[in-house]
Amino acid sequence: MMDIHQILKLLPHRYPFLLVDRVVELERGERIQAIKNVTINEPFFTGHFPNRPVMPGVLMLEALAQAAGLLSFDMMGEAPGDDKVFYFVGIDGARFKRPVEPGDQLILDVKLDRIKGGIYKFGGVARVGDSVACEAEIMCTMRTVA
């Protein structure tokens, strides 16, 4: 549905902070499913943890937020410019259920719950196979920057 080249046009993130590799499903204004292929080459594994590498939970949340950003830009039907940025403004109910290790494929399911007062609220679940790795409610807003 969306390859890395299309993702790079919509997200400002770059290595080592781009955490979405592909979009596999997208229902405009409703939901998105994306993937992050987790490899031993991720820079965070050097220190988290050297003898038992585990993806930091906060980066799983960031991957969900990036998927939410892709859903939002697609919903608006426009690509971001230098003057528009989506900011991650809040999170509720974050829960971590299982570790994510090198070789795992993180499946990111995000649905838009509502838009109110310029705040977009999403429900997100990150899975490895059928096993939930983390879940949270994510809030973002778009801002025009100079």
Curated annotation (Swiss-Prot):
Belongs to the thioester dehydratase family. FabZ subfamily. The keyword Lipid metabolism applies. It comes from Paracidovorax citrulli (strain AAC00-1). Its EC number is 4.2.1.59. GO terms for cellular component: cytoplasm; membrane. Involved in unsaturated fatty acids biosynthesis. Catalyzes the dehydration of short chain beta-hydroxyacyl-ACPs and long chain saturated and unsaturated beta-hydroxyacyl-ACPs. Pfam families: FabA. This is 3-hydroxyacyl-[acyl-carrier-protein] dehydratase FabZ. HAMAP family: FabZ. The gene is fabZ. Keywords: Cytoplasm, Lipid A biosynthesis, Lipid biosynthesis, Lipid metabolism, Lyase. One of its GO terms (biological process) is fatty acid biosynthetic process. Its main location: cytoplasm. Disulfide bonds: none annotated. One of its GO terms (molecular function) is (3R)-hydroxyacyl-[acyl-carrier-protein] dehydratase activity. It catalyses: a (3R)-hydroxyacyl-[ACP] = a (2E)-enoyl-[ACP] + H2O. InterPro entries: FabA_FabZ (IPR013114), FabZ (IPR010084), HotDog_dom_sf (IPR029069). It comes from the Bacteria. It is found in: Cytoplasm. The active site is at H48.
